[in-house]
Amino acid sequence: MATARAKARGSEAGARCHRAPGPPPRPKARRTARRRRAETLTARRSRPSAGERRAGSQRAWSGAPRAAVFGDECARGALFKAWCVPCLVSLDTLQELCRKEKLTCKSIGITKRNLNNYEVEYLCDYKVAKGVEYYLVKWKGWPDSTNTWEPLRNLRCPQLLRQFSDDKKTYLAQERKCKAVNSKSLQPAIAEYIVQKAKQRIALQRWQDYLNRRKNHKGMIFVENTVDLEGPPLDFYYINEYRPAPGISINSEATFGCSCTDCFFDKCCPAEAGVVLAYNKKQQIKIQPGTPIYECNSRCRCGPECPNRIVQKGTQYSLCIFKTSNGCGWGVKTLVKIKRMSFVMEYVGEVITSEEAERRGQFYDNKGITYLFDLDYESDEFTVDAARYGNVSHFVNHSCDPNLQVFSVFIDNLDTRLPRIALFSTRTINAGEELTFDYQMKGSGEASSDSIDHSPAKKRVRTQCKCGAETCRGYLN
């Protein structure tokens, strides 16, 4: 059974962008002077005049910066399936260029209706002058140098006003400077905090959109940080399945499959492997920890509704990556109730050799971070490293009294050296409750003394446990 090594918090994904591939070549239409100007990408940034500026309703950022697409391709890009390419020009820059050249482009949100409207991105500061309340506005798609003071009566962005007020109260509560609440102007430190909080909120929203674009399962992913100003990890890439390191091959095609008409009652894939069916009629796991799960695979004749296809369907629950307040970094909580013995998520990452894991383990231990998960169901040849490549499970914290249990799963790849790692609930988990598993969990559900006593990588540094459970062992490793 797989054993997870001690892990800590790391970094996050660089910006990705979307671009829609263009249609087949068509006879070129004669370009107008306006289109030629747009294609040169030389339009200068201009500041909106006071007469033009209008504080419209705020709309959430819907994605990371996008590639520059002009001409016919820009107009028709939304009709084609998006794919990732390196960023060329930011979305804000594209929007500004379109407004400058009076061009519309639905794929980047510029229409005839909003072409001349200026949108509030966030509020930076506050003051009262001659009895009138003013807010310093950061305009979406415009640099900070174009920020302007606008009277409250001109602002139609209740959510941003509410966020501004909440951020101010949060800062004052943290600093215990409650006397400044009714001041006619904000102290520079408060204004700076509010701006940083607004920028963090935008960055987390972009990251949340990135995660949901990358996932291939039903459950949605949300992100929140109400604790500090930390933004998304900078060097983390979301993947949905194992990523083999160079020199490692993972067979993705099954060698045999069942021909059952009813996999719940007929002799099925588990029987062929010498084990029992892992699930009951309610799709809950019924086997003991340490027993492998053999699901139906791509060669089986049964359909997607087969009762022996659970892990391969992916996470069905909406989860939230959140910043913990107890010093454990990022964590994961469920937003819906999860029944006991239900599949929650799969642990994925980069598959490396045990020798490479020892080398990386030294580096990670010196930095106080590691996401190494040993695949030792039968042998100890491979390890999953989720430090840079992983899914939501990358952020799940340790607990000595966890609510998730580890199981080894075999679907298309039947190589016992490379089981897939599934996490099932051990009890009913209520909405809002943090998800945890034991980093030293073995098939029996107990800590592996062998792993702790004999692993050279784990002898180097002992990481203190902060789970707070009554049965806490004191250390993660």
UniProtKB/Swiss-Prot annotation:
Residues 461-477 form the Post-SET domain. The modification Phosphoserine is found at residues 448, 451, 455. Zn(2+) 1 binds at residues 258, 260, 263, 268-269. Residues 1-59 are annotated as: Disordered. Its main location: nucleus. Its EC number is 2.1.1.355. One of its GO terms (molecular function) is transcription cis-regulatory region binding. One of its GO terms (cellular component) is chromosome, centromeric region. S-adenosyl-L-methionine binds at residues 328-330, 371, 397-398. Testis specific; predominant expression in type B spermatogonia and preleptotene spermatocytes. Zn(2+) 3 binds at residues 263, 296, 302, 306. Transmembrane segments: none annotated. Although the SET domain contains the active site of enzymatic activity, both pre-SET and post-SET domains are required for methyltransferase activity. The SET domain also participates in stable binding to heterochromatin. This is Histone-lysine N-methyltransferase SUV39H2.
